[in-house]
Amino acid sequence: MEKKGVVIVTGSCGRIGTQIVKRLASSYSIVGFELLKAIYAAEKEELVPVDLSSDESVHQAFSHIKSMYGKKISSVIHLAAYYSFKDQFSPLYDKITVRGTHRLLEQLKNFEVEQFIFTSTMLVHQPQEPGHPITEDSPLRTDWGYPLSKVQTEKLIHEQRGKIPTVILRVAGVYDDVCHSIPISHQIQRIYEKSLESRLFSGNVHHGASFIHMQDLVDALELCVEKRKSLPEESTLLMGEPKTLSYDQMQKSIARLLGQKEFKTFQLPKLLAKLGAWMQGLLPSDTETFIKPWMVDLADDHYELCIDRAKKLLDWSPKCTLEETLPKMVDALLKDPLQWYKKNGLHMPYSLRRKFQK
Protein backbone atom coordinates (compact mmCIF):
# COMPACT_ATOMS: atom_id res chain seq x y z
CA MET A 1 0.00 0.00 0.00
CA GLU A 2 1.38 3.39 -1.01
CA LYS A 3 1.92 5.74 1.92
CA LYS A 4 0.01 9.03 2.06
CA GLY A 5 3.00 10.98 3.36
CA VAL A 6 5.37 11.46 6.29
CA VAL A 7 4.17 12.00 9.87
CA ILE A 8 6.60 12.96 12.63
CA VAL A 9 5.56 12.07 16.19
CA THR A 10 7.56 13.57 19.06
CA GLY A 11 7.42 11.47 22.20
CA SER A 12 6.49 8.50 20.03
CA CYS A 13 7.42 5.92 22.68
CA GLY A 14 5.14 7.43 25.31
CA ARG A 15 1.66 6.08 26.05
CA ILE A 16 -0.12 8.39 23.60
CA GLY A 17 2.69 8.29 21.06
CA THR A 18 2.74 4.50 20.93
CA GLN A 19 -0.99 4.35 20.23
CA ILE A 20 -1.06 7.02 17.51
CA VAL A 21 1.94 5.43 15.79
CA LYS A 22 0.09 2.10 15.67
CA ARG A 23 -3.00 3.82 14.29
CA LEU A 24 -1.26 5.74 11.50
CA ALA A 25 1.54 3.34 10.55
CA SER A 26 -0.43 1.53 7.84
CA SER A 27 -1.21 4.76 5.99
CA TYR A 28 1.81 7.01 6.63
CA SER A 29 5.58 6.78 6.91
CA ILE A 30 6.08 7.37 10.64
CA VAL A 31 9.19 8.96 12.10
CA GLY A 32 9.32 8.98 15.89
CA PHE A 33 11.37 11.52 17.83
CA GLU A 34 12.49 10.28 21.25
CA LEU A 35 15.07 11.42 23.78
CA LEU A 36 16.86 8.08 23.65
CA LYS A 37 16.74 5.51 20.91
CA ALA A 38 14.54 2.78 22.33
CA ILE A 39 15.48 -0.87 22.03
CA TYR A 40 12.17 -1.59 20.35
CA ALA A 41 10.55 0.81 17.92
CA ALA A 42 6.97 0.27 16.84
CA GLU A 43 6.44 -1.78 13.71
CA LYS A 44 6.82 0.36 10.55
CA GLU A 45 8.23 3.28 12.57
CA GLU A 46 11.68 4.80 12.22
CA LEU A 47 12.93 6.03 15.58
CA VAL A 48 15.27 9.03 15.67
CA PRO A 49 16.99 10.05 18.95
CA VAL A 50 16.28 13.73 19.62
CA ASP A 51 16.98 15.95 22.62
CA LEU A 52 14.52 18.85 22.33
CA SER A 53 16.66 20.91 24.70
CA SER A 54 19.57 20.85 22.23
CA ASP A 55 19.76 22.99 19.07
CA GLU A 56 22.29 20.62 17.53
CA SER A 57 20.26 17.49 18.26
CA VAL A 58 17.09 18.91 16.70
CA HIS A 59 19.05 20.18 13.69
CA GLN A 60 20.62 16.76 13.12
CA ALA A 61 17.23 15.06 13.33
CA PHE A 62 15.76 17.25 10.61
CA SER A 63 18.86 16.89 8.45
CA HIS A 64 18.17 13.17 8.58
CA ILE A 65 14.51 13.73 7.70
CA LYS A 66 15.45 15.84 4.68
CA SER A 67 17.99 13.32 3.38
CA MET A 68 15.72 10.30 3.86
CA TYR A 69 12.23 11.64 3.17
CA GLY A 70 12.59 14.97 1.38
CA LYS A 71 11.08 18.31 2.34
CA LYS A 72 7.39 17.39 2.43
CA ILE A 73 5.82 16.54 5.80
CA SER A 74 2.12 15.71 6.09
CA SER A 75 1.85 16.30 9.83
CA VAL A 76 3.91 16.82 12.96
CA ILE A 77 2.22 15.49 16.10
CA HIS A 78 4.05 17.17 18.97
CA LEU A 79 3.46 15.17 22.16
CA ALA A 80 6.82 15.51 23.91
CA ALA A 81 6.75 17.88 26.90
CA TYR A 82 7.81 18.14 30.52
CA TYR A 83 5.26 17.25 33.19
CA SER A 84 5.70 16.49 36.88
CA PHE A 85 3.57 16.64 40.03
CA LYS A 86 6.75 16.96 42.09
CA ASP A 87 7.20 20.74 41.88
CA GLN A 88 4.80 23.62 41.30
CA PHE A 89 7.36 25.27 39.02
CA SER A 90 10.45 23.91 37.28
CA PRO A 91 12.93 25.35 34.75
CA LEU A 92 12.40 22.17 32.71
CA TYR A 93 8.97 23.41 31.63
CA ASP A 94 10.63 26.24 29.72
CA LYS A 95 13.68 24.26 28.65
CA ILE A 96 11.78 21.30 27.18
CA THR A 97 8.18 22.32 26.48
CA VAL A 98 8.55 25.95 25.40
CA ARG A 99 12.07 26.12 23.98
CA GLY A 100 11.82 22.61 22.57
CA THR A 101 8.78 23.63 20.52
CA HIS A 102 10.63 26.74 19.36
CA ARG A 103 13.47 24.55 18.07
CA LEU A 104 11.04 22.34 16.17
CA LEU A 105 9.32 25.29 14.49
CA GLU A 106 12.66 26.85 13.52
CA GLN A 107 13.69 23.68 11.70
CA LEU A 108 10.26 23.14 10.15
CA LYS A 109 10.56 26.47 8.33
CA ASN A 110 12.88 24.63 5.94
CA PHE A 111 10.16 22.11 5.04
CA GLU A 112 6.75 22.04 3.37
CA VAL A 113 4.57 21.17 6.36
CA GLU A 114 0.86 20.55 5.94
CA GLN A 115 0.07 20.53 9.67
CA PHE A 116 1.53 20.98 13.16
CA ILE A 117 -0.47 19.46 16.05
CA PHE A 118 0.37 20.45 19.63
CA THR A 119 -1.11 18.60 22.59
CA SER A 120 -1.90 21.22 25.20
CA THR A 121 -4.14 20.74 28.24
CA MET A 122 -7.58 21.78 29.45
CA LEU A 123 -5.74 23.06 32.54
CA VAL A 124 -4.72 26.19 30.60
CA HIS A 125 -8.25 27.38 31.46
CA GLN A 126 -9.38 28.79 34.76
CA PRO A 127 -11.70 26.34 36.53
CA GLN A 128 -15.42 27.11 36.53
CA GLU A 129 -18.45 26.19 38.61
CA PRO A 130 -20.54 23.07 37.84
CA GLY A 131 -23.06 23.75 35.10
CA HIS A 132 -20.78 26.27 33.37
CA PRO A 133 -18.81 24.34 30.72
CA ILE A 134 -15.44 25.71 29.63
CA THR A 135 -15.05 26.69 25.97
CA GLU A 136 -11.93 27.44 23.95
CA ASP A 137 -12.55 31.15 24.62
CA SER A 138 -12.79 30.82 28.42
CA PRO A 139 -10.20 32.69 30.57
CA LEU A 140 -6.70 31.21 30.89
CA ARG A 141 -4.64 30.42 34.01
CA THR A 142 -0.90 30.57 34.62
CA ASP A 143 -0.60 29.94 38.36
CA TRP A 144 1.54 26.79 38.16
CA GLY A 145 4.23 25.47 35.87
CA TYR A 146 2.38 22.94 33.74
CA PRO A 147 -0.48 25.11 32.40
CA LEU A 148 1.85 28.12 32.25
CA SER A 149 4.23 26.25 29.94
CA LYS A 150 1.35 25.21 27.70
CA VAL A 151 -0.04 28.77 27.50
CA GLN A 152 3.42 30.07 26.63
CA THR A 153 3.90 27.37 23.99
CA GLU A 154 0.49 28.01 22.42
CA LYS A 155 1.43 31.70 22.11
CA LEU A 156 4.81 30.81 20.63
CA ILE A 157 3.18 28.53 18.03
CA HIS A 158 0.77 31.30 17.02
CA GLU A 159 3.61 33.79 16.61
CA GLN A 160 6.17 31.52 14.93
CA ARG A 161 4.16 29.09 12.82
CA GLY A 162 4.73 31.07 9.62
CA LYS A 163 2.66 29.40 6.91
CA ILE A 164 2.27 26.11 8.77
CA PRO A 165 -1.38 25.28 9.63
CA THR A 166 -1.68 24.43 13.32
CA VAL A 167 -4.01 22.53 15.63
CA ILE A 168 -3.92 23.03 19.40
CA LEU A 169 -5.62 20.22 21.31
CA ARG A 170 -6.45 21.15 24.92
CA VAL A 171 -6.72 17.64 26.27
CA ALA A 172 -8.43 16.42 29.45
CA GLY A 173 -6.82 13.82 31.72
CA VAL A 174 -6.14 10.65 29.74
CA TYR A 175 -7.02 7.16 31.00
CA ASP A 176 -7.50 3.66 29.60
CA ASP A 177 -9.08 0.36 30.65
CA VAL A 178 -6.27 -0.41 33.13
CA CYS A 179 -6.29 3.21 34.38
CA HIS A 180 -2.89 4.80 33.58
CA SER A 181 -4.11 8.07 35.08
CA ILE A 182 -2.06 9.40 38.00
CA PRO A 183 -4.93 11.02 39.95
CA ILE A 184 -7.44 8.22 39.32
CA SER A 185 -4.98 5.41 40.12
CA HIS A 186 -4.02 7.07 43.40
CA GLN A 187 -7.68 7.56 44.30
CA ILE A 188 -8.39 3.88 43.61
CA GLN A 189 -5.28 2.88 45.58
CA ARG A 190 -6.29 4.87 48.66
CA ILE A 191 -9.76 3.30 48.76
CA TYR A 192 -8.47 -0.20 47.97
CA GLU A 193 -5.96 0.00 50.83
CA LYS A 194 -8.63 1.53 53.12
CA SER A 195 -6.21 4.26 54.13
CA LEU A 196 -7.25 7.19 56.29
CA GLU A 197 -6.50 9.54 53.38
CA SER A 198 -9.20 7.84 51.32
CA ARG A 199 -11.85 9.35 53.60
CA LEU A 200 -10.44 12.89 53.54
CA PHE A 201 -10.50 15.58 50.86
CA SER A 202 -9.47 19.22 51.10
CA GLY A 203 -11.65 20.48 48.25
CA ASN A 204 -15.30 20.66 47.29
CA VAL A 205 -16.39 17.03 46.87
CA HIS A 206 -19.04 18.13 44.37
CA HIS A 207 -16.38 19.38 41.96
CA GLY A 208 -14.43 17.23 39.52
CA ALA A 209 -12.43 17.11 36.30
CA SER A 210 -13.08 15.98 32.76
CA PHE A 211 -11.22 12.95 31.40
CA ILE A 212 -10.79 11.27 28.02
CA HIS A 213 -10.18 7.63 27.09
CA MET A 214 -6.95 6.95 25.22
CA GLN A 215 -8.76 5.51 22.20
CA ASP A 216 -10.99 8.59 21.91
CA LEU A 217 -7.91 10.82 21.93
CA VAL A 218 -6.22 8.68 19.29
CA ASP A 219 -9.41 8.89 17.20
CA ALA A 220 -9.26 12.69 17.45
CA LEU A 221 -5.58 12.84 16.49
CA GLU A 222 -6.21 10.60 13.49
CA LEU A 223 -9.12 12.80 12.38
CA CYS A 224 -6.93 15.89 12.70
CA VAL A 225 -4.37 14.35 10.35
CA GLU A 226 -6.95 13.03 7.88
CA LYS A 227 -8.88 16.33 7.76
CA ARG A 228 -5.78 18.56 7.77
CA LYS A 229 -6.51 20.15 4.40
CA SER A 230 -10.04 21.18 5.39
CA LEU A 231 -9.27 22.61 8.84
CA PRO A 232 -8.74 26.35 9.47
CA GLU A 233 -5.17 27.71 9.41
CA GLU A 234 -5.28 27.80 13.20
CA SER A 235 -7.58 25.59 15.25
CA THR A 236 -7.88 25.26 19.03
CA LEU A 237 -10.01 22.38 20.29
CA LEU A 238 -10.99 21.11 23.73
CA MET A 239 -10.80 17.32 24.00
CA GLY A 240 -12.62 15.55 26.81
CA GLU A 241 -15.85 13.96 27.94
CA PRO A 242 -18.66 16.49 28.38
CA LYS A 243 -19.91 14.76 31.53
CA THR A 244 -17.73 15.40 34.58
CA LEU A 245 -17.94 13.08 37.58
CA SER A 246 -17.54 14.85 40.91
CA TYR A 247 -14.93 13.69 43.43
CA ASP A 248 -17.74 12.33 45.59
CA GLN A 249 -19.24 10.38 42.68
CA MET A 250 -15.82 8.91 41.93
CA GLN A 251 -15.29 7.99 45.59
CA LYS A 252 -18.62 6.21 45.90
CA SER A 253 -18.32 4.44 42.54
CA ILE A 254 -14.84 3.11 43.30
CA ALA A 255 -15.80 2.07 46.83
CA ARG A 256 -18.90 0.26 45.57
CA LEU A 257 -16.88 -1.58 42.93
CA LEU A 258 -14.48 -2.66 45.68
CA GLY A 259 -17.33 -3.93 47.85
CA GLN A 260 -17.37 -0.99 50.26
CA LYS A 261 -21.05 -0.04 50.08
CA GLU A 262 -21.25 2.83 52.56
CA PHE A 263 -18.58 5.41 51.84
CA LYS A 264 -18.48 8.95 53.17
CA THR A 265 -15.78 11.50 52.40
CA PHE A 266 -14.99 14.17 54.98
CA GLN A 267 -13.78 17.64 54.06
CA LEU A 268 -10.43 18.54 55.58
CA PRO A 269 -9.53 22.22 56.15
CA LYS A 270 -6.88 23.32 53.66
CA LEU A 271 -4.42 24.43 56.31
CA LEU A 272 -4.52 21.00 57.93
CA ALA A 273 -4.26 19.30 54.52
CA LYS A 274 -1.15 21.33 53.66
CA LEU A 275 0.40 20.58 57.03
CA GLY A 276 -0.36 16.88 56.64
CA ALA A 277 1.11 16.78 53.13
CA TRP A 278 4.22 18.61 54.33
CA MET A 279 4.69 16.23 57.27
CA GLN A 280 4.21 13.17 55.06
CA GLY A 281 6.94 14.47 52.81
CA LEU A 282 9.32 14.54 55.78
CA LEU A 283 8.65 10.98 56.91
CA PRO A 284 11.18 8.30 55.87
CA SER A 285 9.67 6.25 53.05
CA ASP A 286 10.78 4.23 50.03
CA THR A 287 8.21 6.00 47.88
CA GLU A 288 7.43 9.66 47.35
CA THR A 289 4.07 10.99 48.54
CA PHE A 290 1.66 11.96 45.77
CA ILE A 291 -0.08 14.92 47.43
CA LYS A 292 2.17 17.98 47.75
CA PRO A 293 1.26 21.05 49.86
CA TRP A 294 0.94 23.29 46.78
CA MET A 295 -1.61 20.91 45.23
CA VAL A 296 -4.10 21.48 48.05
CA ASP A 297 -5.11 24.85 46.58
CA LEU A 298 -6.12 23.07 43.34
CA ALA A 299 -8.53 20.68 45.09
CA ASP A 300 -11.55 22.95 44.52
CA ASP A 301 -10.98 23.18 40.75
CA HIS A 302 -13.84 22.06 38.52
CA TYR A 303 -13.45 21.28 34.82
CA GLU A 304 -16.50 20.66 32.69
CA LEU A 305 -15.96 20.95 28.93
CA CYS A 306 -17.95 22.12 25.94
CA ILE A 307 -16.69 20.13 22.93
CA ASP A 308 -18.97 21.65 20.28
CA ARG A 309 -16.04 22.96 18.23
CA ALA A 310 -14.42 19.52 18.00
CA LYS A 311 -17.76 18.03 16.99
CA LYS A 312 -18.13 20.62 14.25
CA LEU A 313 -14.60 20.61 12.80
CA LEU A 314 -13.71 16.94 13.25
CA ASP A 315 -17.12 15.28 13.51
CA TRP A 316 -15.73 13.81 16.73
CA SER A 317 -17.21 12.99 20.10
CA PRO A 318 -16.08 10.52 22.78
CA LYS A 319 -17.26 6.93 22.43
CA CYS A 320 -16.10 5.93 25.93
CA THR A 321 -16.94 7.36 29.34
CA LEU A 322 -15.07 7.27 32.62
CA GLU A 323 -18.26 6.13 34.32
CA GLU A 324 -18.40 3.02 32.11
CA THR A 325 -14.65 2.37 32.29
CA LEU A 326 -14.20 2.52 36.09
CA PRO A 327 -15.52 -1.07 36.48
CA LYS A 328 -12.89 -2.27 33.98
CA MET A 329 -10.12 -0.51 35.93
CA VAL A 330 -11.21 -2.01 39.25
CA ASP A 331 -11.72 -5.44 37.68
CA ALA A 332 -8.13 -5.33 36.36
CA LEU A 333 -6.96 -4.44 39.88
CA LEU A 334 -8.87 -7.27 41.54
CA LYS A 335 -7.75 -9.86 38.98
CA ASP A 336 -4.05 -9.11 39.42
CA PRO A 337 -3.23 -6.50 42.09
CA LEU A 338 0.55 -6.81 41.69
CA GLN A 339 0.43 -6.20 37.95
CA TRP A 340 -2.08 -3.36 38.29
CA TYR A 341 0.12 -1.56 40.81
CA LYS A 342 3.16 -2.11 38.58
CA LYS A 343 1.44 -0.89 35.41
CA ASN A 344 0.26 2.25 37.20
CA GLY A 345 3.61 2.97 38.82
CA LEU A 346 2.26 2.57 42.37
CA HIS A 347 4.03 1.33 45.48
CA MET A 348 2.27 -1.59 47.16
CA PRO A 349 2.64 -1.76 50.96
CA TYR A 350 4.69 -4.69 52.20
CA SER A 351 1.70 -6.25 54.01
CA LEU A 352 -0.28 -6.41 50.77
CA ARG A 353 2.67 -7.47 48.65
CA ARG A 354 3.42 -10.37 51.00
CA LYS A 355 -0.21 -11.47 50.82
CA PHE A 356 -0.27 -11.66 47.01
CA GLN A 357 3.19 -13.14 46.58
CA LYS A 358 2.34 -16.25 48.59
PLM features per residue range, with description:
Residues 143-167:
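Active-site Tyr-X1-5-Lys
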Residues 223-291, 307, 323, 327-328, ...:
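Mid/C-terminal beta-alpha module of Rossmann-like enzyme folds, strongest
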Residues 6-26:
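N-terminal Rossmann NAD(P)H-binding glycine-rich loop of SDR-like oxidoreductase domains
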Residues 103-145, 167:
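Conserved Rossmann-fold NAD(P)-dependent oxidoreductase catalytic core, especially the SDR/UDP-sugar
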Residues 176, 201-207, 235-245, 255, ...:
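Glycine-rich Rossmann NAD(P)(H)-binding loop
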Residues 39, 52-99, 107:
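NAD(P)H-binding glycine-rich loop region in Rossmannoid oxidoreductase-like domains
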